[in-house]
Design a protein with these regions (language model features):
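Short Gly/Ser/Thr- and charged-rich N-terminal loops/segments
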Residues: 30-46, 55
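Conserved beta-strand/loop scaffold segments within soluble protein domains that form the structured core
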Residues: 1-28, 52, 56-206, 210-213, ...
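Extended amphipathic alpha-helical segments enriched in small hydrophobics
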Residues: 207-228
Length: 257
């Protein structure tokens, strides 16, 4: 796997989409890569329109290492559809003052998928910001492992770093193991981490059904709303809507199995 360098002053948005049309395994994950520059300039990978989404495949692996230099920003969005096994390891270093990195991820599993995600976020210098937000849905006999770590060096004062991993279980046979971690060696920081594993709220379902919404539609609404904070990080509106529709279709298939 490769290295992605975000040069000083650049703003980059990277979107990696794993779906069942791709052979995706631990030693050769090949997601579609869709990229756009963020507001403020910078460069990114070639753009793909929503019309390209069902068929366009860019055989670029997600980088294993990302280095963000002074006053640069990177947003990475990782989306994993049902039917995909993958092992994602991402090491991010904020290597210049004023650097920022945001890593977002959403995954939906409904069979016997095995999804592993490991993110290490290194704050080496002062005045840097990072956020990790991963939200997932696990059904069937799927297995999800999430390992996230924030490492704040002694010299990295005025750091702000946040990490969240939230999951919904759809079956008793699905398993989620989540391990958020903090290693802080500086004094003047704002850092937090958290993880949750729960079920769909039946009271919400009852409320929606009392207003004429079917149980299937109620569950779909709950799950799409659950992952929507990740989908909202997709800057291209047409891509966001197309991907949300693809997630909805896959979620309906899982419900109706």
């Amino acid at each position: 796997m490769g290295k992605l360098l975000i040069n000083s002053g650049e703003c980059i948005h990277k979107l990696y989409l794993y779906d069942g049309r791709l052979t995706c395994c631990s030693d050769d994950p090949r997601p579609r890569e869709l990229g756009h520059p963020l507001a403020g300039g910078g460069t990114s990978s070639p753009q793909s329109s929503s019309n390209d989404l069902p068929t366009a495949i860019c055989n670029k692996e997600i980088p294993q290492t990302i280095v963000v230099e002074r006053d640069a920003k990177v947003d990475v969005v990782i989306l994993i559809m049902p039917g995909v096994n993958c092992d994602i390891k991402l090491d991010v270093t904020l290597a210049g003052e004023g650097a920022e990195a945001n890593i977002y991820g959403a995954y939906v599993c409904g069979g016997e998928e095995k999804v592993k995600i490991a993110v290490d976020m290194h704050h080496d210098l002062p005045h840097c910001n990072s956020r990790q937000l991963f939200k997932g849905i696990a059904g069937g006999k799927s297995r999800v492992d999430f390992y996230g770590k924030i490492i704040v060096a002694q010299d990295a004062q005025r750091t702000e770093a946040y990490q969240e991993n939230h999951n919904i279980l759809l079956s008793d046979d699905a398993k989620v193991d989540t391990k958020p971690q903090l290693e802080i060696y500086a004094d003047d920081v704002k850092c937090s981490h958290g993880a949750t594993i729960g079920r769909l709220n039946e009271e919400e379902q009852f409320y929606m059904r009392s207003r004429g919404i079917t149980l299937e539609d109620a569950k779909v609404l709950q799950m799409i709303s659950f992952i929507s904070p990740v989908l909202e990080s997709i800057v291209d509106v047409s891509q966001r809507e197309t991907i949300a529709a693809e997630f909805e279709s896959n979620i309906r298939n899982i419900i109706n199995r």
